[in-house]
Design a protein with these regions (language model features):
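Sec/Tat signal peptide C-region and signal peptidase I cleavage site
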Residues: 54-60
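Proline-aspartate-enriched helix->loop->beta-strand connector
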Residues: 267-281
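Mobile, glycine- and charge-enriched loop segments
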Residues: 200-257
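Intrinsic-disorder/low-complexity accessory segments
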Residues: 61-204, 244, 250, 256, ...
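Bacterial N-terminal signal peptides
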Residues: 43-53
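Short, low-complexity, charge-dense intrinsically disordered segments
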Residues: 4, 10-24, 30-33
């Protein structure tokens, strides 16, 4: 049977490192040859869902005035070789809402690319008539405060189960958005169907046609363009969400993307008791993965939420099996340790949040599977406890995936209808218990002191909490907690609130359990990262309060009703404006000053600033005070107007190029989003842009986002994508980058892109982790401490002495023979660098370099062997690459670098 972890994916996505495909018994030509036969069968297949027994064997009769999907779209979602895009889906939902009194559309905002985003609220007409009442009941039960058990029980008895269902986040997982159309039609049109009647009476369905409208349009357009060609099932060469692609499901608590913000805002408004998101694909050869998940789970999840999650999973499997739909599997491959999944973060707000993974071939192209293709241990079709009805192979079509998804959605709605009152009351119990737990035990609160190295990032952390529905207070006078006095203006998060588990999940350090395939075997691979402690990532000091907060201290706190960033200001008189390098916002200000026509430089001498003595402060002149005051307000910076300081090294606005391959690199998207937000205006560099050379004439700095050396060098191989999207930088691109650096340019490589720079630019640096087996060294993503080795170097300006970096599958570096440059940051020599998460044999890192500057000719290569901008969360390490961007402009002297082995500046204490 299945290992609890080992997955056998059915060609879900092709990366640049997976160019060699195994030949398939059923070819794309076979599929196209069957298209005519398939289309002839489409009409007969269209009524499958109604005939397989979803309503106890009776056909659900549609009212005449409710349009069928076919009547609006011209095709039935699920048909072979057909995908409806978002615009078409939206048009159908509009027709449905016009025709049915069970459907109401609401606008939840706009997408990144400016599409209007609407979702359907589906329930009985009498429920829709009093929708605000049911929303208020759900909100009261989700909060729990001000209710006793009797009052909560009465509300649960009166209320309706609000259930979130959606068409998925990941647009290449195409079945979800097609299923939404059919599910909406069924709920809007069914007559004489007891199951649907019970759902409409007891449940209010929040049906999101898709959680990624932009991506649905992009993927559908790509498929239609290639349909009938040899590239029919080729992967999309660009991100299907403008900036983050697949990581749109890693943004659950940060809410960086506008789509994430819309989902979180809407969920807080409606307070659904269940949040169910559809994904693809299932571990092969199973047809659908359903919770329970594999170990481990967070201890911050209320047990009732976990119990109901498992109940829903088992009910889905039973529902499908009862209707002749085999292949459901549990406890294989997917854990939910990381809380940042957009479809899971809500469980820390006591909403039963989960996902399923339904089998996928590619797009709407069918595929035949024989048992001979199954993994050897699956060919005997033996049933197991968590795989009770093995799938026996055969054709798998988009229609099949759509039907499994509709069945799963109906099972969830059926469960919600039958257990409406208990679900609502249990959610109240979870909120009640959370308040009680932190009323009577630590941590009683967390303090975010007003005195911070980067107050702007502390304020950003507060904003992130508030967007997640967390209540934050501010101290009107010095706040005493656990024997420590925090200054007035400090933020306080009292933990006796219903969503406190999310605060604890984000603020505490993670201790991932030791899980191995065998006592001496390799570690079991987590599904995602193991450590994410947000204050550590953002470089913000947060203090837990371990004694009860007194009534007097509470009285001095004021609830922050609406987030407002710290007030920026300009003080003093003078022709030069100076501000600290320590806040990340200083880079926003630099770029805004350039846009205003100012002259900008860095003060290479140590000077007195409000935050203390500092090297690398920023000085600006040639701009009006009004302009500086506006920029200070927008950047929340304290600026001093002074006489022109000594030692200013003038710079010009950096010209930044960002490499963007045709492999849909998520790290590139995150990098682009951050650079744009900070005003750098990066220029996209495709393969041919770099191969054309003359880069130094156009750019000061070029960034290579995280990717394998092979992916950067080779890209997709021939035959996988149309020719214009194949290949990587190749030898011509490597030569152009070498020329760029030799001519004085700065090349900045993130994480594994460092290995590309080492290999293809011939850098005398080695990866000390190369060749190690997982049992010899393992880190799936955790937070590690590094020590800054040379605080006087401009690449280190503004950084604390001991920043915390996100290490995720990258190298650890060591200078080799002939090295000329500097080690900028190293892992501590005499202790484990682990701060949060799981690290096996961390001694392999001790004393090794995490960030290196290598000199080549008149330029530099920066090797950042970690994720300095990981998912838009690791704000505390942004300066590693933002500082490096300006290195081509003479901030440090390349003619006198420290040789390898020189004694570094020892860190004495945290800065």
């Amino acid at each position: 049977m299945f290992s609890s972890r080992i997955l056998r994916w059915d060609l879900t996505a092709i990366s640049a490192d997976q160019n060699q495909r195994k030949p398939r018994k059923t070819t794309l030509l076979d599929c196209r040859a069957m298209r005519q036969t398939t289309m002839m069968k489409a009409a007969a297949a269209a009524s499958f869902l109604m005939s397989v027994g979803f309503a106890d064997g009776a056909l659900a009769q549609a009212t005449r005035n409710v349009p069928t999907p076919e009547s609006v779209l011209g095709k039935r979602p699920g048909d072979d070789f057909y995908l409806a895009n978002y615009d078409e889906s939206r048009a159908y939902f509009k027709k449905l809402a016009e025709a049915s009194d069970r459907v109401r559309l609401i606008n939840v905002g706009k997408t990144t690319r400016g599409l209007d985003w609407e979702i359907a609220i589906i329930s009985a007409p009498e429920n829709l008539a009093t929708l605000d009442r049911y929303k208020k009941i759900s909100q009261k039960l989700a909060d729990g405060r001000g209710l006793d058990d009797a009052a909560a029980r009465a509300l649960a008895r009166e209320g309706k189960a609000i259930v979130h269902l959606d068409g998925g986040l990941h647009s290449t997982e195409v079945a979800g958005a097609q299923h939404s159309i059919l599910l909406a039609h069924r709920l809007a049109s069914a007559q004489g169907d007891p199951e649907v009647d019970a759902i409409l009476k007891n449940v209010i369905v929040m049906l999101w046609p898709t959680l990624n409208p932009d991506g649905q349009n992009a993927v559908t357009a790509w498929y239609r363009k290639n349909l009938g060609t040899v590239y029919e099932v080729s992967p999309l060469p660009d991100l299907y969400q403008e900036y983050v692609g697949h990581d749109n499901n890693r943004d659950g608590y940060m809410n960086n993307m506008v789509e994430s913000q819309a989902v979180t805002r809407t969920e807080l408004e409606w307070a659904p008791v269940i949040f169910y998101c559809h994904h693809q694909t299932a571990p092969f050869p199973t047809r659908i993965f359903i919770p329970p998940f594999v170990e481990p789970i967070s201890g911050n999840i209320h047990p009732l939420m976990g119990r109901w999650l498992n109940v829903l999973g088992m009910n889905i499997a039973a529902y499908l099996d009862a209707r002749g739909m085999p292949g459901a599997v549990h406890r294989v491959g997917f854990d939910n340790w990381y809380p940042g999944f957009l479809d899971y973060t809500h469980i820390f707000r006591n909403s039963i949040s989960f996902f399923t993974e339904t089998a996928l071939y590619r797009y709407a192209t069918p595929r035949f599977y024989s048992v001979d293709e199954f993994p050897a241990d699956q060919r005997n079709l033996t049933a197991g406890v968590m795989y009770a009805s093995p799938w026996k192979g055969g054709w798998w079509r988009l229609k099949d995936a759509v039907e499994y998804m509709e069945g799963a959605s109906m099972a969830v709605l059926d469960t919600a209808a039958k257990f409406r009152e208990e679900l609502l009351f249990n959610r109240y119990q979870a909120a009640r218990d959370n308040v009680s737990a932190f009323t009577n035990g630590p941590p009683y609160a967390y303090v975010i002191p007003a005195r911070q190295r980067d107050l702007g990032e502390a304020a950003t952390l507060v904003e992130k909490l508030m967007v997640n529905g967390i209540e934050v207070h501010q101290a009107g006078k010095p706040f005493h907690a656990s024997g420590v006095e925090h200054p007035a203006g400090s933020f306080v998060v009292l933990m006796d609130q219903p969503f406190s588990p999310l605060v604890k999940e984000l603020f505490e350090t993670q201790k991932y359990p030791e899980l191995r395939e065998s006592p001496n075997g390799p570690p079991i691979r987590p599904y995602d990262v193991t450590g994410w402690t947000l204050p550590l990532q953002m470089g913000v000091h947060v203090a837990p309060v371990l004694q009860p907060v007194s009534a007097a201290e509470r009285a001095a706190l004021t609830r922050v009703a609406k987030f407002a960033p710290p007030a920026g200001r300009v003080e003093g008189a003078g022709v030069s404006y100076v501000f600290s390098h320590r806040p990340n916002a200083s880079f926003k200000a630099i770029n805004a000053l350039f846009a205003a026509g100012a002259q900008v430089g860095f003060v290479s001498a140590e000077i007195d600033m409000a935050e203390g003595r500092e090297t690398g402060a920023i000085a600006a002149s040639g701009v009006s005070r009004d302009t500086v005051e506006k920029i200070a307000r927008e950047s929340s910076l304290s600026v001093k107007a002074v006489a022109v300081p000594k030692g200013v090294v003038g710079v010009k606005k950096a010209r930044v190029g960002l490499y963007r391959s045709w492999t849909a690199n998520i790290d590139e998207g995150w990098t682009r989003w951050i650079l744009e937000n900070y005003g750098f205006a990066p220029v996209t560099l495709r393969n041919d842009s770099i191969q054309g050379g003359n880069l130094r004439e156009r750019f000061d700095a070029i960034i290579l986002p995280d990717a394998s050396a092979k992916s950067i060098r080779d890209g997709f191989g021939p035959g996988i994508l149309p020719g214009e999207y194949t290949g990587g930088l190749g030898s011509q691109g490597a030569a152009a980058l070498r020329e760029f650096v030799q001519a004085g340019g700065t090349l900045i490589a993130f994480n594994n892109a460092s290995l590309y720079a080492i290999e293809d630019l011939g850098l005398p640096v080695k990866n000390v982790l190369a060749g190690l087996k997982p049992e010899e060294f393992y880190c799936s993503g955790c937070l590690l401490r590094v020590d800054i080795q040379d605080e006087s170097h401009s690449a280190s300006w503004g950084l604390p002495r001991e920043p915390v970096v996100m290490f995720e599958g990258g190298p650890a570096l060591e200078p080799g023979e002939g090295f000329v440059g500097r080690v900028l940051a190293s892992y501590p020599k005499n202790q484990s660098p682990l701060m949060s998460g799981y690290l096996l044999h961390g001694e392999k890192l001790q004393g090794k370099a995490a960030a290196i500057e290598v000199q080549q000719g008149r330029g530099r290569v920066y090797l950042l062997a970690f994720r300095p901008q990981w998912r838009g969360q690791s704000h505390g390490t942004y300066k590693f690459f933002m500082n490096a961007i300006y290195e081509s402009q003479g901030l440090s002297n390349p003619s006198s670098p420290k040789p390898a082995g020189a004694t570094p500046t020892p860190p004495d204490k945290k800065g």
